[in-house]
């Protein structure tokens, strides 16, 4: 199984307004099929006021610029006709500030007030987020404070209220009925106060649902493992970082430790990736990777057990340095051709890094057998031919600082994988490993 994360606004335009949309995605199915994609993860598509879409104001309507419900269903049908499943990003930890529920709560409606989390006399109003020290409690003009872990425009939902749980369960069932195949649950570790409570929450929430359920649990291994047994798929932030760090330092140690910690022996599928919307792109890691190091990172990604997930444009070497508050710089328009003046091209903003005639386009790289796209296509074909690797076991055969060798195997298959992280040729067991290359035998 191979996944592909898409920021809809930047991917493909279907109505010539420069904004990516459902019609554009429908028109892009052939490219994704050629790339070997089995499921697409669409970043939030619901009505919201932000560019990123994680502050939903109506879960039952789509962003107007993305298209209608009819176009959404037609898009899903086109994906399904090509054997590609659709996974939606679903941020149900909170709503947007302008959501009808929160607006009614602000006006004093007791029913909807209990949909959110409010401070009381015992609340520490100076409580701060663990990752950046920002305040969690936000004031209103009347002196009340509400909880918004992800900022004042994203008030937290109150899951102590069973009606909130039921509302979100109805939403999930509604979307599944529309043909959606699964969800990436945003901020999944923050639904309840403790690991144990959070695990119970998700176990109950998902108990009667079937689909692809990805969890964003950016945390230590124990929390990831506890949730993985429920979700079945876990975004592997640990190995994502360590692939890049190992390639950057030309040293295998952090990668070996991460594979042992986050890949081997799991009773769920790690979803491995090299970048996403919350970090700098692969090509821009630590100031920028060479073409050889980008390709090596992709090779490692596609030769690990679990599910490889590609962030749109990483198959082209798109650049982007994540920096607050302008995080949209990692969400540049996807370049379909060199001039970026072609039907389907999005242009909702000027590219911060990946402008016209940069060599970063589908058109240009399809003509070049040595391109990052051609390299990625080779690995996606490899995974399609070896789908057993998703659940393969991994045994290290050699752990040198500059190169590593491991065996992937199950009851019927076996392959040896050789990664050379150095700039010099290496020979091991008769296999020549060129600089920054991967060999599979």
Swiss-Prot record:
It comes from the Bacteria. Ca(2+) binds at residues 13, 15, 17, 19, 21. Keywords: Calcium, Carbohydrate metabolism, Cytoplasm, Glycosyltransferase, Metal-binding, Transferase. Its cofactor is Ca(2+). The record marks 278 as: Transition state stabilizer. The active site is at 186 (nucleophile), 216 (proton donor). One of its GO terms (cellular component) is cytoplasm. Its EC number is 2.4.1.25. Binds 1 Ca(2+) ion per subunit. InterPro entries: 4-alpha-glucanotransf_C, Alpha_amylase, Glyco_hydro_13_cat_dom, Glyco_hydro_b, Glycoside_hydrolase_SF, O16G_dom_2. SUPFAM superfamilies: (Trans)glycosidases, Glycosyl hydrolase domain. It catalyses: Transfers a segment of a (1->4)-alpha-D-glucan to a new position in an acceptor, which may be glucose or a (1->4)-alpha-D-glucan. One of its GO terms (biological process) is oligosaccharide catabolic process. One of its GO terms (molecular function) is 4-alpha-glucanotransferase activity. It is found in: Cytoplasm. Monomer. Belongs to the glycosyl hydrolase 13 family. This is 4-alpha-glucanotransferase. It comes from Thermotoga maritima (strain ATCC 43589 / DSM 3109 / JCM 10099 / NBRC 100826 / MSB8).
